[in-house]
A protein has these predicted regions:
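Active-site acidic carboxylates
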Residues: 1-117, 199, 211-214
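Glycine-centered short loops/turns at secondary-structure junctions
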Residues: 57-60, 144, 170
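Hydrophobic beta-strand scaffold residues
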Residues: 62, 173-175, 202
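Internal catalytic-core helix/loop-beta-alpha segment
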Residues: 100-148
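Short acidic-hydrophobic, aromatic-tinged amphipathic segments that line or gate anion-handling sites
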Residues: 123, 200-208
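A short glycine-rich beta-strand->turn/loop micro-motif centered on a GG-aromatic cluster
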Residues: 149-153, 170-185
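Short glycine/serine/threonine-rich phosphate/pyrophosphate-binding segments
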Residues: 156-162
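Active-site-proximal loop->helix
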Residues: 183-196
Length: 214
């Protein structure tokens, strides 16, 4: 018997969930004027807002995987790396790489412009991959969701790691390209053009919203 395809190009509010990854104050409202300008030039927050508004209009549940590390770093494994996150000098025994924002801090709160409402689901996480030892997979499957739209940052770190996890769990993938970002060179462009198209669909917010109501 032939296998019946369940592929559907539309993004229905029933079968699709929106994932807003690490939309924290510390990332979206940093103490770096240069980074804030970078995000503003690319309309990252307004694009995330438009995507969230579109999802809510069709009753789509939104999930917020958000870093929630212990203040003392006890839930983070120290590791030796060739470089730090910005390709500078790496971690060492006397200079370990620790979480940037810790649970309970203002920086670890979700940015107010895209704050969750009562029907949304906040997923505390302690690793890049939002599915790793969290209940994100359970929360999605319990609602009958088989496709995810993802936005946030950083594209080359948590977004990529989460999408590799989603693919291994057989979720359909849509990447909202103009609502994702990386401040590290051309990493965002590389993933959007060379990696993610092999895993799912890459499109702008306007196209995502249009498919939500298709």
């Amino acid at each position: 018997m032939a296998r019946v395809s369940r592929l559907d190009p539309a993004l229905s509010g029933v079968r699709t969930g929106l994932i807003i990854f690490d939309a924290l104050n510390g990332y979206l409202h940093s103490d770096s004027a240069e980074k804030d300008a970078f995000l503003a030039e690319r309309n990252i927050i307004p694009n995330m807002q438009r995507l969230l508004e579109g999802a809510r209009k069709v009753g789509m549940t939104t999930f917020y995987p958000s870093g929630a590390h212990a203040d003392d770093g006890s839930d983070t494994v120290l590791r030796l790396t060739d470089t730090d996150m910005d390709l500078g000098v790496g971690g060492s025994a006397d200079k370990p790489i620790k979480p940037r924002f810790t649970k309970g801090s203002k920086a670890a709160e979700i940015a107010p412009e895209i704050a969750p409402i009562a029907t949304d689901v906040v997923i505390p996480k302690r690793r890049w991959n939002s599915f790793h030892q969290t209940d994100l997979d359970l929360q999605l499957r319990a609602r009958g969701i088989d496709t995810i739209i993802i936005c946030g940052g950083s594209t080359d770190v948590g977004i990529a790691s989460t999408l590799f996890g989603a693919r291994d769990l057989d979720y359909g993938i849509v990447v909202a390209s103009d609502a994702c970002y990386s401040t590290r060179g051309d990493n965002n462009k590389f993933f959007m053009e060379r990696v993610f198209p092999r895993m799912g669909r890459v499109m702008g917010v306007d196209a995502c919203v249009a498919l939500m109501t298709a």
